[in-house]
Amino acid sequence: MRFINIKTIHISFAGLLAISLMTSVASASYKQWPMVSKGEVRYLKMIKVYDISLFSPTKITADNVLNTNVSKCLKVDYAVDLTVDKFRLATNKILQRQHSPDYLKSIQQPLETLQSAYKPVKKGDTYNVCYNGSNQFIRLELNDKKLVEIKSAELAKAYLGIWLSKNKPISRPLYNSLFKNK
């Protein structure tokens, strides 16, 4: 018969508690952070594609938003249905417009991992793209369910830059809306 020492139980419990706390920090949710700004994207200035909200636990400006130590989250609420092919096409088109082929090659593997997690959306669905500046994980969620989490500060900078970069963002009116007064 084996006896379990109380000290062993305390150490085991402390270890489990520490792991659970680290996990919750690694996947910190935008719901815990204040909304910094919001905007919308329209196709041909008439058809609303989505509303987007930017969340962060720290002060965000246009100058620091893509710093790799700044945690942030984009919540994208879709007003239309979109296929995975349309997501891939839009992502690749904007990234090619913003970055050199050499840079895109340097993030190719994590980008492919992220894109392989894409799911089609229906009107009313929500994608969250969150980045934790402490552990450098970018996380993609659909309707609050994790699709993928990747450790890559460079991927996060490029991917979130689709909306947040000064350099040819997906929509200049959206960018201006997100960063007015910032």
Label each region the model flagged.
Residues 2-14:
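Bacterial N-terminal signal peptides that target proteins for export
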Residues 27-182:
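Terminal leader/tail segments of proteins
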Residues 17-21:
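Hydrophobic core
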